[in-house]
Amino acid sequence: MTMSSFLINSNYIEPKFPPFEEFAPHGGPGGGDGAVGGGPGYPRPQSAPHLPAPNPHAARQPPAYYAPRAREPSYPGGLYPAPAAACPYACRGASPGRPEQSPAPGAHPSPAPQPPVPLGHCAPGPTTPAVATGGSAPACPLLLADQGPAGPKGKEPVVYPWMKKIHVSAVNSSYNGGEPKRSRTAYTRQQVLELEKEFHFNRYLTRRRRIEIAHTLCLSERQVKIWFQNRRMKWKKDHKLPNTKMRSSNTASAPAGPPGKAQTHSPHHHPHPLPGASTPIPSSI
């Protein structure tokens, strides 16, 4: 009776709470209370603001770390297709428990992955827009490599010594292939005239004179020596003279003839009998 009179006479105001539906998942054994125990005497915590339920049919936006990377403009899109297994839910917009849903009307559909292209060919990938600076997108690297080393200025390609063709004689086995075949020297009319004048006076040159002629005619000492060798062979052929080298080799290789038979004479043998010498007369029987 005392308790009932206290409740009637006191200014105690009974608190009002939200409906039971909002706190049903978080309520304790006391029913609609948000605190453990659910007694009416306990102070109740402030309730969280009411959030609307998510729409299950709305398209889920993929997180930032699942977003596909933007392709760089230097590579065509056909060479590097985006892997489909990297973002299965972000690309399809569905979770394992929900069926696949059509994309939202404002979202752009992701392009379908293209099949890989062999390395030897250049696929015509999607045309990338021009760069903001005004330059066009770079072309295929394979096509740029096929244009050759000559640049836009028309420069000649660089030819290194190892790229030149070397004439190697198959007969000479001791040839190591380091020196190319010597080209034939083309003498000018002035050089030939001076060499002919020198040959008219001296068919054989000393080393000092050969060096002087080579320096005067802008030739090498070897070229002057070879020219005089060839000119001497021509002169001998014109005068029908035997080759000096062949004659010397023939005389050296010819065997010596058989020596004459030496006659041996005995000191007591006389081919003719001396006068007054008596010849032995055979005795007759």
Curated annotation (Swiss-Prot):
GO cellular component entries: nucleoplasm
Q: What residue spans carry the region label Disordered?
A: 19-70, 94-130, 238-285
Q: Where is the composition biased (Low complexity)?
A: 44-70
Q: Which Gene3D superfamilies match?
A: Homeodomain-like (1.10.10.60)
Q: Where is this motif: Antp-type hexapeptide?
A: 159-164
Q: Which organism is it from?
A: Mus musculus
Key words, A-Z: Developmental protein, DNA-binding, Homeobox, Nucleus, Transcription, Transcription regulation
Function text: Sequence-specific transcription factor which is part of a developmental regulatory system that provides cells with specific positional identities on the anterior-posterior axis. Binds to sites in the 5'-flanking sequence of its coding region with various affinities. The consensus sequences of the high and low affinity binding sites are 5'-TAATGA[CG]-3' and 5'-CTAATTTT-3'.
- What's the disease link here? Overexpression results in abnormal gut development (megacolon).
Q: Which gene encodes it?
A: Hoxa4
Q: Which family does it belong to?
A: Belongs to the Antp homeobox family. Deformed subfamily.
A Gene Ontology MF term for this entry? DNA-binding transcription factor activity, RNA polymerase II-specific
Gly residues biased stretches: 27-41
Q: What ranges are recorded for DNA binding?
A: 180-239
Please give the positions of the paired cysteines in each disulfide bond: none
What's the protein here called? Homeobox protein Hox-A4
**In which residue ranges is the amino acid composition biased (Pro residues)?**
106-118
Name its cellular compartments: Nucleus
Q: Which residues form a coiled coil?
A: none
Pfam families named in the record: Homeodomain
BP GO terms, sorted = anterior/posterior pattern specification; embryonic skeletal system morphogenesis
